[in-house]
């Protein structure tokens, strides 16, 4: 992990910013139901951000980060990776994510990412980006080469050359 479980995003909240947020369930094309946290500015912009968390999946850090993006005019949705193995309910800070991470696949993570991208497109987000951290950083690079029609991808602490049971992001893009 790149930071403690009780960390907050380094970007301060904008006092008085008008945003909406909700926990929701998305359905991927393969039938997986996944948890997601959506934050939208009350005056929608044209940019959407899919947040791809670290190995711990969806928790408060990424919910707060989605809110910070929305306060700055961007719709943001943070997804959870563990719908296939742990269900789509919310989990506490003591969640044992390790066994669930081991069961993820690139195809599953990308199906979930595509569901989030499509949800943002349904909100009229024209330019959509992925921003991922650690495990999600790698997933962000893979998303760039997976045909989601993204405007860009940012991977923080992720490796574009590491493989997880399939071609690496670099190989997918070749």
Residue ranges and their predicted role:
Residues 1-174:
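N-terminal cap/leader regions of alpha/beta-hydrolase-fold enzymes
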């Amino acid at each position: 992990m790149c930071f403690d479980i009780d960390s907050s995003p380094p970007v301060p909240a904008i006092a008085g910013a008008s945003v909406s947020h909700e926990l929701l369930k998305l359905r991927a094309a393969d039938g997986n139901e996944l948890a997601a946290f959506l934050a939208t500015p009350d005056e929608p912009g044209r940019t959407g951000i899919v947040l791809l968390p670290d190995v711990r999946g969806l928790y408060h850090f990424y919910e707060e980060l989605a809110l910070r993006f929305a306060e700055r005019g961007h719709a943001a949705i943070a997804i959870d990776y563990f719908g296939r193995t742990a269900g789509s309910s919310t989990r506490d800070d003591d969640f044992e994510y390790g066994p669930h991470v081991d069961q993820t696949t690139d195809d599953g993570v990308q199906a979930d990412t595509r569901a989030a991208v499509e949800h943002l497109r349904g909100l009229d987000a024209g330019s959509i980006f992925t921003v991922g951290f650690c495990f999600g950083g790698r997933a962000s690079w893979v998303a760039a080469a997976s045909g989601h029609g993204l405007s860009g991808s940012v991977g923080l602490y992720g490796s574009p050359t590491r493989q997880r049971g399939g071609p690496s992001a670099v190989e997918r893009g070749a």
